[in-house]
Amino acid sequence: MKRLTLLAAAIALLASCTGSPKTEDAGWNNSVIYELNTRQFTPEGTFKAAEDQLPRLKEQGVDVVWMMPLYPIGEKGRKGTLGSYYAIKDYCATNPEFGTLEDFDSFVAKAHQLGMKVILDWVANHTSPDHAWVTEKPAEWYYRDENGNTVIEYDWTDIAKLNYGCEGVREAMLEAMRFWVARGVDGFRCDMASLVPEDFWTPTIATLREEAGKPLFFLAEAEEDWMHRAGFDAMYAWRFHHLINDIAQGSKGKAELLEEVQTFVDAQGRKRLCFTSNHDENSWAGTEFERMGEAWQAMSILCWTLPNSLPLIYTGQEAGLSWRFKFFEKDEAPHWGNGEYAEFYRYLCAQRHGHPALDADAGFELLESGDDEIRFIRRKAGDEVLVSVQLKAPWKWSISSEADRIERVEPMCWWTGMKTPLQLLVKGEGIGEWNACFKDAKGVRVTGTHKADSPNYLFVDVEIAAGAQPGTYRLHFSKGEKSFSIPYELLERREGSAERKSFSSADLMYLIMPDRFVNGNPYNDNSAVTTEKADPKAFFGRHGGDIAGISSQLGYLEDLGVTAIWNTPLLEDNVDKESYHGYACTDYYHIDSRFGSNEEYRELVRDAHEHDIKMIMDIVTNHCGNRHWWMEDLPFKDWIHVWPEYTHSNCCFSAQNDPYVAEIDRYNMESGWFDTSMPDMNLDNPYLLQYFKQWAVWWIEWADLDGFRVDTYPYNEKYPMSEWCASILEEYPDFNIVGEVWSNNVPQVAYWQAGNPNRDGFNSNLPAIMDFPLQTAFCQALSYHGKVNWDEGLVKVYDCVANDQYYHDKDNMLIFTGNHDQERIADCLGKDAGSVKNAFALLATLRGIPQVLYADEVFAVSKDRSQGHGGLRVDFPLEWEKDPQAKDMHDYFKALFNWRKGCEAVHNGELKHFLRRDNTYAMFRIAEKEKVFVFVNNNEAEVQVPWADYSEIGTDAQWFDVITGQAVDPAHLSVAAKSNIILQTR
């Protein structure tokens, strides 16, 4: 199985980049079908649980989901506890075991949204003995014996056979199938189809297709020639299946295989479903490992590459399912993950989708080979694939083509209607010496190619005309007599994508470190293609949190008042240790498999949007990980900053705008490495800069993102980064980007915000910056409760806010009480609940965009402060409600920030604060129709609110406490020690 880990590059190249369903009928020629056993697919065994797995199937490469029978199961003659799926009691309902019709509709809608089709398992031959038709319809609707009892077939004691000699049966069956077509299904897999007359299938299939208004797919569980004549698109390859079992067991060989292959060649478009397992084989004959042993991969290759074949994956095969599913009972669900079996099937799907030569209708040429091997070539549309399979141990196999030299093409796909120019990075052995062009691609053409320092790269400029249509184009490469092509997909851009809105001062941003949040899928904690394994007890190890965990908490976050999520990087970080944080990226276009997949991330964004939560991606342009794939073969010598030995950045931001700076100091600031495991990228290289521009746009379009947070912003080359920001905003004018500028020097921080009148003329084009000075002021001010001198206590907050004169856009500052790099606010404030609530009160009401670190709302503290980052980045305490102090903090936070959602004065109102040197802070936020008053008492004693001091505000109004909703007279108001009050006019 080790060889499967070597397939990752091929998968990355060939994997589908579908952004939306295609409207044209693909003819099913390259479709991958997945048989979904709802009962056993998930621990819950429901449509809802299965729906959650659809993004994984899409990422796997599945095109068509075949749902095993989902109808109510008869009770009369029932086998086992739950019964056989194929003993149907009602054709127009769902089995309550699986869920409701509405649950099924949701499943179909989600599959269609992902670009997959759904077909139903249809059992037209028989019903259960207690189907209503048995007693409510004429007796002749069923075959009956001389005593009037319904007839069974084989050992199927739980069924009653229908009589298609009755017109009523035909009409009722057609009407039942219409019911499901109207609900959006895309076709039917017809059980035991040959037992139902041809003269039923022929008009029924034709009628359903005519009425559907879209292509419908019909698959027959049969192998009679008349199936195609009746209108079926494909039929089972039962004979072939039993043959490959025999070959694997040594009782048959090449001669029998060639004879069977000839029937595939002669099929002339009549497709055959090929499989190594299905529900019958798994439960009754055994798993593919039982039947085929070590030959299972080789036999799979035949299923996926022969002419006129359609490949099937049965539930659990992609997880290495090693047991026979119980047929009449609930069984253990497969252990989903990203192991070598998933990699194998992902590779097969990628080959099938990436090569027209592997379409069902592609040409076939058998080659000479030894007695224990079959070799053949498949050809279509200029594409050519060589397949070789050994028919005896050691069962070697290969799928090869000239295109195998291509390891990567990035971006992996693109969109119509974009402003950002497209330049493809093509990585492959010696590809720099090849020519590139698009053939027969109206509106899409190559305008230039550029060699790199390494011969294994080619940069290809692509022009996409305004009228270019979405679709899969072929990028052709040629060198002398040699040529090959690869697919490149151009997607239709979402309507309104360019006008997307972003995060603002009206939002509450919730910072999640995914590995330390919630583990929603323990099966992906480790992966065959990543190095570091999970170690939940290690401070700096991987704990297992993932995308599924974030998704599971969206309802909690919405209820909390969260309107935006910033998660620390989810992209692949395959360094040897401390990879949990994600800041040492090793692949810019793929989500780390221990978090999930690209499709799961996109689904998370969709789900978040349904909860009215925006999604902000944390991106790193300054450095990559030392195990990034390009580190073994850099495109250009100056792709990264190379030093004679490890040279750390001097971390001195002032070198970027110091009028007296020495050049060596400025260069070291920009070019020194951030860490020994994080090589510093050189954005002065124009190809790298263009790479990062496209990469950012790609993720915005692909995942439908709402914003970026840029890590270590001033460490980048500042002029290229200014250009990078400008290019993103040219594509998305209302998009927001916040940069990390970690300094307590207000003018130094202000220098990096777009529009700031810098004396050197520099404009970063960076819309938002993180307000580290204010965060420091929060911690220093609220942790001091002693006698107040000139610069102690809450005057620090006053002074910091007074420095807003330096900021070009004070409302577009990200303000926070802490983040993943700093001590938690409860730690900073001595675990004092009143002080933490005061911090949240200031966070909710001061200017800017509030951000809170995950779990701070439940009064989380570091596990071990001596462990630094590893100690503060605790796992989210899912049982927080059992802790009264955590629940009290949560309830306060929830009330505060849900109130903030609807408060225009806090979002955009004028700010007026009042200077006092008694360790209190008073502030008004003033909008046209409302005012908000905030008073924070940081003393260890009660304080009277000096309401008369605020007369200039015009305080004659009725005021209400925003937490309790009660009316308050602020002229006679005292605020308890280490507490606050927030009032609002109505």
Positions of predicted regions on the chain:
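Sec-dependent N-terminal signal peptides
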Residues: 4-13
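Carbohydrate-interacting/catalytic domains
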Residues: 16-66, 72, 105, 110-111, ...
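Substrate-binding/active-site clefts of carbohydrate-active enzymes
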Residues: 20-48, 52-63, 69-183, 203-217, ...
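Structural recognition of the beta-strand scaffold that forms the well-ordered cores
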Residues: 33-35, 64-69, 119-120, 189, ...
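Active-site-proximal helices and loops of the catalytic beta/alpha 8
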Residues: 108, 175, 186, 191-275, ...
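Active-site clefts of carbohydrate-active enzymes
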Residues: 268-290, 810-830
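Beta-strand/beta-sandwich contexts
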Residues: 401-433, 486, 490-495, 499
